[in-house]
Amino acid sequence: MTTALAEGIDAAKGNFRRTAEALSTEIAPLATETDAVGIDRYRLASRQFVGTTVDLAETYEWGKQELARIEQLQRETAERIRPGASIKEAMAVLDADPAYQITGTAALKVWMQERADEAISSLDGTHFEVPEQARHIEGMIAPTHDGGVYYTPPSDDFSRPGRMWWSVPDDANTFTTWRELTTVYHEGAPGHHLQTSSAIAAREELNSWRRNYWTSGYGEGWALYAEWLMADLGYMDDPGHFMGLLDGQSMRAARVVLDIGLHCQFEAPEEMGGGEWNWDKAWAVSYTHLTLPTSDLV
């Protein structure tokens, strides 16, 4: 056993060494000197990612308009939270409000499960016909600690239900629900859980690959639309929860602007100084519209 383990370690070391050599001697010389991949490569990659040809210039302009629209909604919502408050000041008010705080991962799991169950119960028979198999979802605390939230679909026979997983950082013990109700709707119902579980349940109408296949543009597009839909249906009337929705949507719109603008070498927004994209302009967009710790932005 010891000999086999040592041989396996040596083999792995050799493979890593050969990979490093190939990257430095074969791949690195082919790399471009600029951060931008260029519009041709980006167009090809976006087609694979979204599933259709994207007019990148048009989408870039849409992203800038969407970012401005969301920022205006954030200002209006900040005024509802505390008259005269800026967006960041309103978020600080929400962070300090005990009404939006949960302590401990056990309480977080209960809150997540209750919100997901409530959404399915209230949507079923009113706005959606939720298949019986899809009416159950499990809220889980993930064994990892990177801070993300994600969804895993049910097994084909539903013996394993769909699950939302919350990856809680090691040092986190207090959670702010105003940011996260929209996440429950994104990952649960009417988001990914309704999306994938409904497809998997349609055994009589869809073959296996149509029930299980995933493309990011369709999959994430559904879940992002689900967040706005819940606002339209009145589930996000609370200004704190609506600010949470806007916070997440602002991040997505900012990424559209930054990613397309930088890689396709479009002119930077006027409020960022115009001209070519550079580190300072990318940082300005990120810092302004992505309310993440500085360590996550760098």
Region annotations inferred by a language model:
Residues M1-L290, S295:
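N-terminal maturation segment of proteins
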